[in-house]
From Swiss-Prot:
Any GO CC annotation of this UniProt entry: cytosol
Cofactor(s) required for function per UniProt: Zn(2+)
Sites where the protein binds ATP: 88, 106-110, 496
Protein name, entry field: Protein translocase subunit SecA
Protein species of origin: Wolinella succinogenes (strain ATCC 29543 / DSM 1740 / CCUG 13145 / JCM 31913 / LMG 7466 / NCTC 11488 / FDC 602W)
Enzyme class: translocase
Functional description taken from the UniProt entry: Part of the Sec protein translocase complex. Interacts with the SecYEG preprotein conducting channel. Has a central role in coupling the hydrolysis of ATP to the transfer of proteins into and across the cell membrane, serving as an ATP-driven molecular motor driving the stepwise translocation of polypeptide chains across the membrane.
Annotated spans, Disordered: 818-838
GO biological process annotation, one example: protein targeting
Keywords: ATP-binding, Cell inner membrane, Cell membrane, Cytoplasm, Membrane, Metal-binding, Nucleotide-binding, Protein transport, Translocase, Translocation, Transport, Zinc
Annotated EC: 7.4.2.8
InterPro entries: Helicase_ATP-bd (IPR014001), Helicase_C-like (IPR001650), P-loop_NTPase (IPR027417), SEC_C_motif (IPR004027), SecA (IPR000185), SecA_DEAD (IPR011115), SecA_motor_DEAD (IPR014018), SecA_preprotein_X-link_dom (IPR011130)
Entry note: cofactor: May bind 1 zinc ion per subunit.
UniProt subcellular location: Cell inner membrane; Cytoplasm
Length: 859
């Protein structure tokens, strides 16, 4: 209470910051008259001179901010017909300073971004603008591209339909690049699998502005980006595990904890499962894979629902993003869960994959020197943005006061009563022509509502993951007279719902939420579809005690109130107390999800340090000017020390005890280089090591003398890269396995994260050693040919090919000759070579008595 009073009197930190920004915006306004009178050419020239002063280092971006913003605003007026409001200038400054601008729907975030983009692109390092889908990336690049072009900037777009590296490289070479978070992230991973620096498409990570920043950095942060390949594991086990899972009974054989999304087998369930699999101990080491498959099969059948968590599309299981409601094409659940869902639905089971490269969005976006974001809903997650990304959220006032009325929630006992009330409300609004946007939490619920509206013969449009392609078109029309639009969470983010004067007089767009989402932000986004730029509107949520949020996370307080009131069929309760109880349930879930994301990040931070070290080394190998000869020298010695250890030849051991035969066998096998025993006999440890090192180096130098110095370096770098990539892939597989089982250490009173850090460090040391030894083995085993040998080999191949062609031509000619002459006219002497080309005399081949053979045989 006291805190709220203090805020009212003195203002919040946010209010004070906005006040300072407004004062700075006034200075930009003072420059407006100066640039208004300039011709287009003079305006362009003024901007170019600012750019040059920044690139020469004469001025900083902050020095030219006022002029840059003033010129960008004037250019926007001329080419787009849009002038930035003062609050939009504030938003531009917030973005430039690497913060998050929270701006309500319809406040023109796309236009705000142009101010920060135009300023930061002056450095010539490239600016990335990240959007949630390809449609928005293309739309914004096209619409804003006219402005950037006027200012002398090139614009690129990175979308899923760009397949070639050359096309992507061309787009990334632009001053301003629009694209989706997935495309930027995957390009980074693919770049770090390339074998040449020139093939890399992403050149820098200087500055990124993330549109709908909450959706990308919060909602999608639990899903890492993974490039994978086949893991070659048996697929039959998934079908067997699914049939065993279906034979088990809930409560009797297993318990389901929906809150924590965990399924546990009972003692009786374990026995039943062992019977189903035909094994004695489900949890023995040899059956570990079966217990894992069963766990995933139970989850697939009891925690994942079709048309809510996934859909079947063209015979494939496709994930539905729980926050956006969109289909996540190409994305698959990991750890065998996707295969378990395929077994459950009876579709083709695709091979389980092995990670080749991965990164979380948290760690990808932290690569940027400067990061900023914008969204309509960020304050509820302000602490997470600050903790994880060091991004401060600034709420920017609307240009016009929001007129939308946000009404209290209505709570019904059952889902049936709730939907009946929703239909009645839609009917009432539809009769007077007021447009309605109905938000649902899943495809299943949107299709239920669709069938109820059909029964009532109310015309409507459905927008869910199954109509993704028509999304923008459908959402644009949601503000028309009499429009009834049912939408899942996607609700066309980034697309404005505009209304005309007639709709304003009817009360504007009416929002009905049929369920509270686990996150308050998603509810606020739905509300934000109405009341843009001072338009009237209203929003209300209809809930029931059967909704997932209230059933799993809600307190008993609401249920007790409803029981005491003894509500009749169709009656509801509506009060601020109930709305607050619902928000408390949401806060619980948000807190749980935050812990989950934080947990994921803590684990990925461990892998991220290793990833950075490996990628840094990889980039050094790709750099042709980087000399790795000293590394080869060091590794050769380390490799030989390891070899001596394998042969049980250790420092301090008497030389008479050395097993030289074993050492010779290992040396020849490891390096494909023979060495005589006499060279090694009677030598002490250090002398023995030096002899081996000298012999190996001499052999290597002799081999490499067949090529010039540049070719030698290329061969060394290429072999190192191949060894590094193979070892890194294997390392990622081991890290995946480690992460899967590390949670069990908690039962042994050990912190799983601490254990993971220890174990992963040991694995990383093994990786480094493995790269050392395998690269030495590959380099010394390589077979090179001299130029003369190569030419001789080529001549031999050409001669062999020539002989083959001659024989084929001879046979073809013979075929032609005999096919055009009757047999009776063929006159061949008995001692002549047989015309069939066999090389035998005619009398011993086709001229023999008896049935004819070869070309002269009767058809």
């Amino acid at each position: 209470m006291i805190t709220q009073l203090t805020r009212k009197i003195f203002g919040t930190k946010n209010d004070k910051l906005v006040k300072k920004y407004r004062q700075r915006a006034q200075k930009i306004n003072e420059l407006e008259a100066k640039y208004q009178v300039m011709s287009d050419e003079a305006l362009k020239s003024a901007f170019t001179s600012l750019k040059e002063s920044v690139q020469k280092g004469e001025k900083s971006l902050d020095d030219v901010l006022y002029d840059s913003f003033a010129i960008t605003r004037e250019a926007s007026k001329r080419v787009l017909g849009m002038r930035h409001f003062d609050v939009q200038l504030v938003g531009g400054m917030v973005l430039h300073e690497g913060r998050i601008a929270e701006m309500k729907t319809g406040e023109g975030k796309t236009l705000v971004a142009t101010l920060a983009v135009a300023l930061n692109a002056m450095k010539g390092e490239g600016v990335h603008v990240v959007t949630v889908n390809d449609y928005l990336a293309k739309r914004d690049a096209t619409e804003m591209g006219v402005l950037y072009s006027f200012l002398g900037y090139s614009v690129g777009v990175i979308t899923g339909d760009l397949y070639g590296d050359s096309e992507r490289l061309e787009q990334y070479s632009s001053d301003v690049v629009y694209g989706t978070n997935n495309e930027f992230g995957f390009d980074y991973l693919r770049d770090n699998m390339k074998y040449s620096l020139e093939e890399k498409v992403q050149k820098s990570h200087a500055f990124a502005i993330v549109d709908e920043v909450d959706s990308i950095l919060i909602d999608e942060a639990r899903t890492p980006l993974i490039i994978s390949g086949p893991a070659n594991r048996k697929l039959d086990n998934y079908k067997i595990a699914n049939s065993v899972a279906l034979s088990l009974q809930k409560e009797k054989h297993f318990t389901v904890d929906e809150k924590n999304r965990v399924i546990l087998l009972t003692e009786e369930g374990i026995r039943e499962a062992e019977k189903g699999f035909g094994v004695d101990n489900l949890y023995s080491i040899e059956n570990a894979i079966l217990s894992h498959h069963l766990d995933q099969a139970l989850k697939a059948n009891h925690l994942f629902a079709i048309d809510k968590d996934y859909v079947i599309n063209n015979g494939e299981v496709v994930i539905v993003d729980e926050f956006t409601g969109r289909l996540s094409e190409g994305r698959r659940f990991s750890e065998g869960l996707h295969q378990a869902l395929e077994a459950k639905e009876g579709v083709e089971i695709k091979e389980e994959s092995q990670t080749l490269a991965d990164i979380t969005f948290q760690n990808y976006f932290r690569l940027y020197k400067k990061l900023a974001g914008m969204t309509g809903t960020a304050q509820t997650e302000a602490s997470e943005f600050l903790q994880i990304y060091k991004l401060e959220v600034i709420s920017i006032p609307t240009n016009v006061t929001v007129m939308r009325k946000d009404l209290n929630d209505l709570i019904y006992k059952t889902e049936r009563e709730k939907f009946n009330a929703v239909i009645q409300k839609i009917k009432e609004l539809n009769q007077k022509g007021q447009p309605v946007l109905v938000g649902t939490a899943s495809i299943e619920k949107s299709e239920l509502l669709h069938s109820l509206l059909q029964k009532e013969r109310i015309p409507h449009t459905v927008l869910n993951a199954k109509q993704h392609a028509k999304e923008a078109e459908i959402i644009k029309d949601a503000g028309k007279k009499g429009a009834v639009t049912i939408a899942t969470n996607m609700a066309g983010r980034g697309v404005d719902i505009k209304i005309d004067d007639e709709i304003r007089s009817l009360g504007g767009l009416y929002i009905i939420g049929t369920e509270r989402h686990e996150s308050r932000r998603i509810d606020n986004q739905l509300r934000g579809r109405s009341g843009r730029q001072g338009d009237p509107g209203a929003s209300q949520f209809y809930l029931s005690l059967e909704d997932n949020l209230l059933r799993i996370f809600g307190s008993d307080k609401i249920k007790n109130i409803m029981d005491k009131l003894g509500l009749a069929e169709g009656e509801h309760i509506e009060s601020g107390l109930v709305t607050r109880s619902v928000e408390n349930a949401q806060k619980k879930v948000e807190s749980m999800h935050f812990e989950s994301r934080k947990h994921l990040l803590e684990y990925d931070d461990v892998a991220n340090e290793q990833r950075k070290a490996v990628y840094k080394f990889r980039n050094e190998l790709l750099d042709k000017s980087h000399d790795i000869s000293h590394r080869i020298e060091d590794n050769r010695r380390d490799s030989l020390l390891n070899l001596l250890s394998k042969a049980d030849i250790l420092e301090g051991v008497e030389k008479e005890e050395y097993d030289l035969d074993r050492l010779l066998a290992l040396f020849t096998e490891e390096y494909n280089t023979p060495i005589s025993k006499e060279l090694l006999e009677g030598k002490e440890y250090e002398a023995l090591l030096l002899t081996l090192e000298s012999h190996l180096k001499e052999s290597y130098e002799t081999k490499m003398s067949l090529v010039d110095e540049n070719q030698k370096h290329d061969i060394e770098r290429l072999i190192y890269l191949q060894v590094l990539d193979n070892a890194w892939r294997e390392h990622l597989y081991l890290m995946d396995n480690l992460k899967t089982g590390i949670g069990l250490r908690g039962y042994n009173q050990k912190d799983p994260l601490v254990e993971y850090k220890k174990e992963s460090y040991n694995l990383f040391i093994e990786l480094i050693e493995n790269i050392k030894f395998e690269s030495m083995k590959a380099l010394h085993s390589i077979q090179l040919r001299t130029k003369e040998e190569q030419e001789e080999r080529q001549r031999a191949q050409e001669a062999a090919m020539q002989r083959l062609l001659s024989e084929m031509n001879a046979e073809a000619n013979a075929n032609l000759q005999f096919s055009h002459q009757p047999q009776s006219e063929v006159k061949v002497s008995r001692n002549d070579p047989c015309p069939c080309g066999s090389g035998k005399k005619y009398k011993n081949c086709c001229g023999q008595s008896g049935p004819k053979k070869g070309l002269l045989a009767q058809a």
